[in-house]
């Protein structure tokens, strides 16, 4: 993972309305194994983070200047240090306007993964710990707590520059339960949500369920294809990459690599060619299936306890809210 440029600034700020104090670094960080390890750990923590949103920049304006500064840097109208200085000063201002915000170390990293350029911006905090020194004494020690990552964004620079239609070249961590504490950071980046990752993932899973049902697959085959989908989606989420429908289709049915893709297009589910995987939605998706003596039952695990009740002692399933099509067939029968 070649690191093109990386720098860290510090903002001192308490959540009590006091002014934020900026300690800006004048030069980029030099290349070292420690820097590479830190960025690798940061990426791993970010990829594992649930509840991310995907979107795009707002139009350039005085309220959202970040994209203009980034463009100036990429066009070589200013260097990376100057770009980061403009950005962190803007973040300092937004922090002062948000009483709930706290300071920390602000990291800017421009790096390359494969053929793709990324910019990661993250607000990092320290944790107190202990260490054993050379004289075998136990001493206090601070370390960057990359596991507690609450404010961060990653911009796919290559996607932004080369795909003008994209609405998902930025990912960012959303605040939990609608909290406003992270809004200032989203405004700092100047991004808006362009893709509903949970909704897109649910639609994909619905399309997959319809596909499996239409194929009338044996139970074992249906389970294998489900595991393939969940495995691929989970793998992409760990990499921080979206799912590609054509690639997924080829994995689901190697003999007919276009079958699932054509099913999606023919049914017009409205899915984008690339979908960011939502881990929470994926974790809820697992199918229970069974077939015997002319009876075939298949349903998603998250319906158990809501629309479907299982009585283990009686060996019965109670199903509520039957599909309209099934009810109509039963009436006619």
UniProtKB/Swiss-Prot annotation:
Signal peptide span:
none
Sorted keywords for this record are: Cytoplasm, Plasmid
GO cellular component terms?
Answer: bacterial nucleoid; cytoplasm
This entry's Gene Ontology molecular function terms read: double-stranded DNA binding; single-stranded RNA binding
Cite the InterPro entries for this sequence. Nucleoid_associated_NdpA (IPR007358)
TM stretches of this protein? none
Location (main, coarse): cytoplasm
Q: What are the subcellular locations of this protein?
A: Cytoplasm, Nucleoid
| The keyword Cytoplasm is annotated on this UniProt entry | yes
Q: Fetch the Pfam families from UniProt.
A: NA37
HAMAP family found in the cross-reference section: NdpA
What the record says about family reads: Belongs to the YejK family.
- Protein name (record): Nucleoid-associated protein
């Amino acid at each position: 993972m070649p690191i093109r440029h990386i720098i860290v600034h510090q903002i001192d700020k308490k959540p009590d309305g006091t002014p934020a104090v900026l300690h800006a670094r004048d030069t980029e960080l030099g290349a070292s194994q420690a820097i590479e390890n830190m960025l690798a750990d940061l990426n791993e923590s970010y990829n594992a983070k649930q509840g991310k949103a995907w979107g795009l920049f707002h139009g350039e304006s005085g309220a959202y200047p970040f994209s203009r500064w980034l463009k100036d840097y990429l066009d070589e109208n200013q260097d990376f240090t100057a770009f980061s200085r403009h950005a962190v000063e803007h973040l300092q201002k937004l922090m002062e306007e948000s009483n709930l915000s706290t300071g920390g170390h602000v990291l800017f990293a421009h790096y390359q993964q494969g053929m793709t350029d990324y910019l990661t911006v993250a607000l990092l905090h320290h944790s107190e710990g202990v260490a054993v020194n050379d004289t075998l004494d136990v001493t206090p020690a601070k370390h960057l707590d990359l596991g507690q990552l609450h404010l961060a964004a990653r911009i796919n620079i290559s996607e932004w520059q080369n795909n003008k239609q994209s609405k998902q070249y930025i990912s960012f961590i959303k605040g939990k339960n609608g909290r406003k504490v992270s809004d200032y950071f989203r405004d700092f980046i100047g991004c808006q949500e362009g893709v509903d990752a949970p909704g897109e993932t649910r639609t994909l899973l619905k399309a997959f369920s319809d596909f499996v049902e239409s194929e009338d697959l044996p139970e074992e085959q249906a389970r294998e294809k489900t595991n393939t989908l969940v495995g691929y989606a989970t793998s992409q989420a760990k990499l921080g990459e979206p799912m590609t429908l054509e690639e997924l289709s080829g994995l689901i049915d190697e003999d007919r690599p276009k079958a699932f893709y054509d099913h999606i297009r023919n049914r017009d589910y409205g899915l984008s060619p690339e979908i960011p995987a939502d881990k929470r939605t994926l974790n809820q998706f697992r199918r229970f299936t069974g077939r015997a003596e002319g009876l075939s039952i298949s349903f998603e695990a998250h319906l158990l306890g809501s629309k479907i009740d299982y009585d283990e002692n009686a060996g019965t399933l109670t199903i509520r809210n039957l599909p309209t099509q099934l009810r109509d067939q039963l009436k006619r029968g």
